[in-house]
Amino acid sequence: MNEEKNAIQTVAEKAKKAGKKVGVTTSVSVDHATPAAFYAHQPDRNMYYEIALDLPKANFDFYAGGGFLKPTTTFDNKKAPSIFPIFEEAGYTVARGYNDYKAKSQNAEKMILIQEEGANPSCLPYAIDRKDNDLTLAQITESAIDFLTKGKNKGFFLMVEGGKIDWACHANDAATVF
């Protein structure tokens, strides 16, 4: 949005309009500031629920990340309908974890890949803290390319954000960064 709070078309929206498939991926939550900048049009980066509601409006083909920060709570802390049925009603298949993605992706028209149920929705674990079945940014990126290149298409646009590296650097956490 610009300073007057008018929506501005994003580069990802321009790619979609040009007939390309579009994916937005991150190692943090899908409704965080950087991924949201490619599909959402909300005046405040902390409007996580409202940002998530913009996801199906953008009608992109693939989204992935840690999860969603406030899937049932509005910016003003009011209870709201879960975003997941809204995504499914808009034609998205929601996969929880890499194995679930592999099982569902072949028949999906549009995909949202997030961590398994019970994992921290704000982000993927750091590599230093990762367990065997944790979703990784490499798996997300591989899945996005696989999904965006299936079938007939005019190419694709893919945004991949390693948001966790930013957090580790801000924390001056050299062991995690290295």
Question: For each predicted feature, which ranges?
Answer:
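Surface-exposed loop and adjacent secondary-structure segments within mature catalytic domains
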Residues: 1-7, 12-140, 145
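C-terminal non-catalytic regions of proteins with extracellular/luminal or membrane-system context
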Residues: 5, 17, 138-143, 149-153, ...
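Active-site His/acidic residue clusters
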Residues: 33-38, 119-131, 152-178
